[in-house]
Amino acid sequence: MAEIKKTWHWSIFSFVLFVAGIFLGLANRNVLQIATMESLATTSNKWFLYQKLWFILPITLVLFSVYFGFVGFPRIQRQGFRYPITIIASILFLFSIVILYTDLWGYQKFFSDFWARSLIVWGIGWLCVWALHFYNMKQNVFHIAVYVFIAFGILFLIVGQIPRISNSPFTLAWSEGSFIYMASAIFDKRIYGVDLPLPYIMSTRHLLESIPFLFNDIPIWFHRLWLVILSLGSAGLLGIIITKKIPDLSRINRISLCLWVVLFVYQGAVYYNILLSVVLLIWGYEKNNFRKSFVFMILASIFGGMNRINWAFTPPILFFIVWIIDHPEVVVGVKAQGLYLFKLALWGLLGAIMGIGALFLYYIGLGGYTFATFIERMSATSVWYRLLPSSTFSLGVLAATIVTVIFCWIILFTKYSRFIQLPGFQKFLLLSMNLLLFLGSIMVSVKIGGGADLHNMDAFLISTLFTFLFSLDWDKVQNLSFKSSSILILPMFILMLVPVGWRIYAIGPVHIRTVARDQNELDILKSTIKKITDECSSPPLFIWQRQLITFGHIDNVEVIGDYELVDLIEMAMAENRPYLRQFANDIENLKFSLVVLDPVPENFGRGKSFSEENSLWYNDVVSVVAENYLEKIVLPQTGTTIFFNYCP
């Protein structure tokens, strides 16, 4: 019998047991709440089986881990346990995918809670760690654990994209169809035979999304696949380029870090067109070539500025962060420090001016919009309470941001980072730049229309990522292991897990919409349009679902350039009264034979998700339409609402 010793293995198992216990307690509470709401009888066979599985499965996983810790890995390997444990891990992994992403046995609702999903991933993840460890006893267990959980996160990310690749003619999300339509507007004459306004929201996004429209008769599912490729590809490209800038990484660690970067940027749902600005910046950056780096900073500012005005300023700041870390000069004296700051400000201002110039060239020069309209869009109301937990964002912007970046900043102030070795003046500059981007991101996040996730915190998330990755002492980090006595092993491990946690949070059943599933509603919409337009001489107005016209599902319909969904909500949030009065006049004069709208918002008072936006939308758009078009048909599956009048 092998001697029982409390080695470093035991410390790992204690940690696994402790975390599993927390997940189990929190998950079980949620399960009991669901069971109570569902009025499930505790004597029913399904509920009885579920209760047993719920307690037996995680406890079994924990007992396995504890047993392995006591017995010792060499003995297990000799006994031939590595093959059974690999089989068990594989079976449970497949079982978890079925439970998390389908409703095959009717139990998926019990795993809709974050803690229940986390418990499954935690238990099966550690089984996979031990299974891999048995095949190579010399491999660093800490590294294996990091690889396994990052792989889980990437898997969840990819599976989560599957429902987006649908051939359904209807929009898959509130604004998805609008962005497809806006991309098509770049080829307006060829597709619609009329001149349409250039899309203005995020110009480079529309330009990139329009690429499939270069070819005729490309189905909508391919356009959606292209969006997924752009999203995953931009994040992957950023990961590849950043890791190439970090020397002396082993191949497996370089791949893992690249994938972790992908997960990190997806925490904030950083849009791919923003990421491509960052990719451009870091691709051209060279530590010993300022001129080349500066040119690419200018290009990144131009690209970023064409998306959002704050991203005209962000690339120069990101460039300075990396440059300061790579060039830790000692700047002594007020005069020298003032000159140093002046040079940074001058270079940054040049980049920002180029970015803003590109924005206005597109917005005013090509798009034909006015500067006054731009100012109106910038002066929208702020909803500060969304910084805190609310119905729009359960975590709140502040708490979610802290969870996302806190461990990066903790590690930056340890011996594993070169940050603490920088001269005081440069440390002050780095902290100031990150603080500036944090405050700027907060200002953008609280603007009405935002605050539902962290996508408007993108500048601060990227600055934290740059500061963290380029400051780390990678020789020390690569030697971290559970055998070491360093207290930093825990925050480093949690840091690797946090992006995976966001992927677990986003898990939901995979439902793929199809043409066949939506055909009935499409037929109703087409027949209604034909009937009303035959009776009335005026054209229909598609505020929502314009992509139906784009791909020919609704034919013989004139496209109205004005009053598109995203444009209209932007004007409502900016309280652009002249624009909204013109809309109201056109509706009151029955300029259109019918109006196709999104689902009419109900119960949108304070305490409801996006209450301010829904209130403005209802008052400025829906109520105006409903008061003048007295008949209404609601397509129940998609929520598409058709307002019309019978013509005499």
Predicted regions: what they are:
Residues F13-V62, V98, T102-Y107, F156-S210, ...:
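Transmembrane catalytic cores of multi-pass membrane glycosyltransferases
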Residues L597-P648:
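Aromatic/acidic, Gly/Pro-rich catalytic loop(s) in extracytoplasmic/lumenal soluble domains
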Residues M1-K6, V66-Q79, A131-K138, T243-L249, ...:
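Membrane-interface junctions at the ends of membrane-embedded or membrane-associated helices
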Residues M1-G21, Q51-G160:
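Start-transfer (signal-anchor) and selected internal transmembrane alpha helices
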Residues L225-C258:
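Transmembrane-helix motifs of polytopic, lipid-linked glycan transferases
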Residues Y200, S527-M573, A584-F604, L635-I642:
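Short periplasmic/luminal acceptor-recognition loop of GT-C membrane glycosyltransferases, typified by
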Residues Q267, S471, S484-D518:
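Transmembrane alpha-helical segments
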Residues F114-V121, G449-L488:
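Hydrophobic/aromatic-rich transmembrane helices and adjacent perimembrane loops
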